[in-house]
Amino acid sequence: MRHEHATHSFFTQALSVAEKKAKRRVQSRVMTKRGSAGLGEVDAEYLQERKRACRIASGAAQLGEMFRLLDSFGLQRSKVQKQLHLGMTGAVLQRIFHMESDAEMKVAMTIHRIKSDKQQFMAITPRRFGKTTAVAMFVAALALAVPGITVAIFSTGRRASNLLLQQVKSLLLCVPGAAAKIISSNVETLHMADGSMTSKISSYPGMARTLRGTGGDLILLEEAAFISPDI
C-alpha cells in the first residue's frame, strides 16, 4: 500500500511538472508572435499543450504507472520476475523518455533502481521459472502505461505465440477500464486505443519467411536459442 501511494504521488507530481513545462512553452511562443495574442487564443493553445504534455510528457509518470500496473494483476511477482522486469524496463527507457532529457531519465532510473538503459537485454533461466508470465505481465503493463507503443513478440511456434498473446489479454482484463481500450483482438495481434493513440501488441511464431515488415518499439524473443537467426 505504501508503494502504491508513493507511485501515485510520483505520478501526480510528474503530471504537474509536465503542465508547467507546457505553460512555459506556450508563453514563449506567445511572446515571439507579432502583435498581441488574444486570451482565447492563448487559452486554446495552452489547453492543447497541456493535453499533449499529459499524454506524452512524463516518461517518469509513465514509468511509475507501469511499475504500479505490474503489481495490479493479482499475481505475486517472484524476486527473479522483478529482476527480469527491471532488465526489460531498461531496454525501453529510450522509448519512454524519447521526448525528455537524459538527466530526467537518469533520475527515474535512480528512483526505480534500474541499473542499465542498454536497449538489448538477455535473460537465461531454467524452464518453469515464470519467464513467460513475466513477459506477459511486462507487455500488458507497458501497453497500458505508454500509449502508442508497438510490441512484437516472437515465440518458438504458433501455439506458443497464441498462448502468450492470450495471457497478455487475460492480464489486461484484470485491470479496471482496460477492456474498454481493446479495439480489436485476434490470435496474432491486439490493438488498444488511448485517446488518439493506438498501441499494438503482436505475437508471432519465429519463422522468418512469414515475417517480413514486422517490428516495433520493443521486440521480445522468447526462447531465443530456438528461434531462427534470420529473425
What are these regions (language model features)?
Residues 2-231:
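Phosphate/NTP-binding elements of NTP-utilizing enzymes
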